[in-house]
Amino acid sequence: MAAEEGVVIACHNKDEFDAQMTKAKEAGKVVIIDFTASWCGPCRFIAPVFAEYAKKFPGAVFLKVDVDELKEVAEKYNVEAMPTFLFIKDGAEADKVVGARKDDLQNTIVKHVGATAASASA
């Protein structure tokens, strides 16, 4: 069973997160994690953009982690500001975008996933 394509998968516990990470690593897919918080205004601003990128770049796995819900995961990756977008390749951190910076986020996705659908970008 492959990870869902074209959607953002919200992880609500560490087991769920670990399962998604393992599945993506086995499939050779880049994982893009949106570290967010319910109280974070910029996070709410960028969430629909992140969801749009999940549709545009089905070759990657898009995960959403609430830092208050999964503190241990946020601490593992040294997340200190929200939103933080972490790029994981082959189980290791490959890149990071901090802040609701739409263009930087898209450019980093293209860099790691490929320009699969970049021509359809806004």
Curated annotation (Swiss-Prot):
The active site is at C40 (nucleophile), C43 (nucleophile). GO terms for cellular component: cytoplasm. One of its GO terms (molecular function) is protein-disulfide reductase activity. Disulfide bonds join C40-C43. PROSITE patterns: THIOREDOXIN_1 (PS00194), THIOREDOXIN_2 (PS51352). Expressed in the phloem companion cells of leaf sheaths and stems. Keywords: Cytoplasm, Disulfide bond, Electron transport, Redox-active center, Transport. Residues 2-118 form the Thioredoxin domain. InterPro entries: Thioredoxin, Thioredoxin-like_sf, Thioredoxin_CS, Thioredoxin_domain, Thioredoxin_H-type-like. The keyword Disulfide bond applies. It is found in: Cytoplasm. One of its GO terms (biological process) is plasmodesmata-mediated intercellular transport. It holds the Pfam family Thioredoxin. The record marks D34 as: Deprotonates C-terminal active site Cys. The record marks G41, P42 as: Contributes to redox potential value. Its main location: cytoplasm. Thiol-disulfide oxidoreductase involved in the redox regulation of MAP kinases. Under reducing conditions, inhibits MPK1 and MPK5 kinase activities. Mediates its own transport from cell-to-cell through plasmodesmata. Possesses insulin disulfide bonds reducing activity. Belongs to the thioredoxin family. Plant H-type subfamily. This is Thioredoxin H1. It comes from Oryza sativa subsp. japonica (Rice). The lineage of its organism: Eukaryota, Viridiplantae, Streptophyta, Embryophyta, Tracheophyta.
